[in-house]
Amino acid sequence: MKRILLSLSFLAVVAVASAQDDKFQKTMEQTITMLDSAKTPEDLTDVAAKFERIADAETTKWQPYYYAALSTLWIGYRDEKIDKDVLGDKADGLISKAVSLAPKNSEVYLLKSMSASLHMMVDPMNRFQKYGTDLREALMTARQLDPTNPRTFYWEGTQAFYTPEQFGGGKAKAKLMFEKSLELYKKFKPENSMSPHWGEEITKQMLEACKGE
């Protein structure tokens, strides 16, 4: 009888844990869909807040911290009037938590690179030495952790696109990176429904911008 009770108790615990995981996954999937369809900084602000609430409830999962940071960074890139340092600092805190939970994950290091770029945009001339180094180091770490991550080549191409040729950038260099990214997207399959999958459409748009020059 004791063994039966112990077995039933164990099964009950497993069932509860499974139900919680299912709820987490469903909530994440719904919020990721909202992120995919977000059009404005206001939309992204709402989505970022939702991911933060999920992260507060699921402190051992890296994905909600990742998506909260990604949403926050996208606000900074799309809203010209907003304080980019404030958003960058907020994203940095979220990224740090994601890194602590997934220290070998290419995607979270890509966000570190994106955040460095956002900080640098405030004053490119005076901040390039610090944040330019941070940007490149985080990007290279992301590439080393997963050489097949198409988003790392998209991001490298984006940096080249907006950097003059005399400083090592230019649209010819960017074009090569975007083409490489799209090659990898053809083979890319997200690990699961919560894995990052963004970037292909914007890469196509950036490649067309290179061809239009």
Task: List each model region and its residues.
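Bacterial Sec-dependent N-terminal signal peptides
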Residues: 1-24
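Amphipathic alpha-helical repeat scaffolds of TPR domains
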Residues: 21-34, 57-79, 104-123, 148-163, ...
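Helix-turn-helix repeat elements of alpha-solenoid scaffolds
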Residues: 37-50, 83-94, 129-136, 175-180
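Short coil/turn and helix-start
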Residues: 41, 78-86, 122-130, 165-169, ...
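Canonical positions in the second alpha-helix
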Residues: 54, 98, 141-142, 181
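Hydrophobic, well-structured mid-protein blocks that either form specific transmembrane helices
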Residues: 87-137
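A contiguous pocket-lining binding segment that forms or flanks enzyme active sites
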Residues: 127-165
